[in-house]
Amino acid sequence: MELTLWTYEGPPHVGAMRIAASMHGVHYVLHAPQGDTYADLLFTMIERRGQRPPVTYTTFQARDLGGDTAELVKRHVQEAADRFQPDALLVGESCTAELIQDQPGALAQGMGLPMPVVTLELPAYSKKENWGASETFYQLMRGLLKQSVPPQPSHDVQAWKHEGRRPRVNLLGPSLLGFRCRDDVLEVQRLLSLHGIDVGVVAPLGAGVEDILRLPQADLNVCLYPEVAESSCSWLERNFGIPFSKTVPIGMGATHDFLVEVHALLGMTPPEAAEGYQRSRMPWYSESVDSTYLTGKRVFIFGDGTHAIAAARICSEELGFTVVGLGSYSREMARPVRAAAKKLGLEALICDDYLAVEAAMAEAAPELVLGTQMERHSAKRLGIPCAVISTPMHVQDVPARLSPQMGWEGANVIFDAWVHPLMMGLEEHLIGMFRHDFEFVDGHQSHLGHAGGAGAGNNHGTESVRASGCQDEAPSGQLIWTADGEAELKKIPFFVRGKVRRNAESYARTVGCKEISSETLYDAKAHYKA
């Protein structure tokens, strides 16, 4: 364990809570002390839901540890079963309760409750939230379907042709506190419907026990979020023979590849390659003259595995950006993230220390950061534009409007979210670059009269006095930037200005120069070939 100001993922019981809260008719009894009830806020504050998550806490206190905490667990399990009468009951423990080793799942299993009881054993000190969500969904689905597993899988993917109906697929993986999951589901449903494909079950988001029991009736499973659903899709394939798609439809190219894969698995005629050009505005802009400003922009990407990999492909193949950093906090997705980074000639950053991520970001000196809420803070400190592409997120990244990431409309949303910060960055740079032009000087004549001229002149005088005084006040050994050096530095775009300043100061120390003038800046640029 470590003490930190920020964590990308919570403990695994938060992942279990996400699954329980995403479904209906499912209740979660969590053996936990008073302090672990904070998780309710994640759903009411960030997701802005109108109801609390379906969780009952045992909320034991320090004085309870001297007594029989097992009886406390059984009492709360019975009360939850009687009060909520769920279709399925999840029983687990928080990271703190794990130390007591009361084994609440085993206690609940022996109580003879009328509903299915699913025991969750989530190692809090070695696993984290996404793994907890994946394991919970897997255990719940496996517990409900184990009685109907056939002796030998005999699934016919093209049974829909013989039965005279449209093909049917399940969408697996979307959950609460996922990044735009609700909107992605609606967009993918619409996308598949346009191609004559029905959606049978969406799980866990919005699903109930009866929906889980209907999962084997689908012709194909669509794994939308591998972090949550890949293990469940693999189990369904092994035991029922139902194949699953592995392409996540985020971006123009990935959406087309997704449709091709789904059509191939279902035995359907593949879609037209030009469909994306007809349904999304992103390709048109990418081929326009205006987009040449974006070509070669340096981008640093960090997030969960699914969104980081998708972002890297969009940046490198569809927008013409140069990816200078790629990483993820999700160790379960480390292998595919490393493979994606290798294709781009990079070494992936697999790390959950936000300070290490910020240091890597500063070292890469990007012009745009695509990351989580934490990268937004880090980028703000470094003066770099940023767009959030992944959880963890702030409430502002859970819009009330529809704002998907998947499908053709998702490509439009992504384009807006990623390109606009760069456009605003260009505007800010131009304003800064021409700040001292005669048309921008406060003392310039204007239709507003002469009220501001004298004051502006005084301000410039004050600034020049302050600038000239800095050289005398600078402590010995500290580098001094001359007025012409500072003026030249300000002409450099703000998103790379920090790197140029560091290079110039490093060069000045190397050659023993105490003052950095415009000439020193040019020499440093030539030295570093930047």
Curated annotation (Swiss-Prot):
It comes from Synechococcus sp. (strain WH7803). Signal peptide: none annotated. Substrate binds at residues 425-426. It catalyses: chlorophyllide a + oxidized 2[4Fe-4S]-[ferredoxin] + 2 ADP + 2 phosphate = protochlorophyllide a + reduced 2[4Fe-4S]-[ferredoxin] + 2 ATP + 2 H2O. Protochlorophyllide reductase is composed of three subunits; ChlL, ChlN and ChlB. Forms a heterotetramer of two ChlB and two ChlN subunits. Component of the dark-operative protochlorophyllide reductase (DPOR) that uses Mg-ATP and reduced ferredoxin to reduce ring D of protochlorophyllide (Pchlide) to form chlorophyllide a (Chlide). This reaction is light-independent. The NB-protein (ChlN-ChlB) is the catalytic component of the complex. The keyword Ribonucleoprotein does not apply. GO terms for biological process: light-independent chlorophyll biosynthetic process; photosynthesis, dark reaction. Pfam families: Oxidored_nitro (PF00148), PCP_red (PF08369). Its cofactor is [4Fe-4S] cluster. One of its GO terms (molecular function) is oxidoreductase activity, acting on the CH-CH group of donors, iron-sulfur protein as acceptor. Pathway: Porphyrin-containing compound metabolism; chlorophyll biosynthesis (light-independent). Its EC number is 1.3.7.7. The active site is at residue 290. This is Light-independent protochlorophyllide reductase subunit B. Belongs to the ChlB/BchB/BchZ family. [4Fe-4S] cluster binds at residue 36. Binds 1 [4Fe-4S] cluster per heterodimer. The cluster is bound at the heterodimer interface by residues from both subunits. InterPro entries: ChlB/BchB/BchZ (IPR050152), LI-POR_suB-like_C (IPR013580), Nase/OxRdtase_comp1 (IPR000510), P-CP_red_C (IPR042298), Protochl_reductB (IPR005969), Protochlorophyllide_Rdtase (IPR016209).
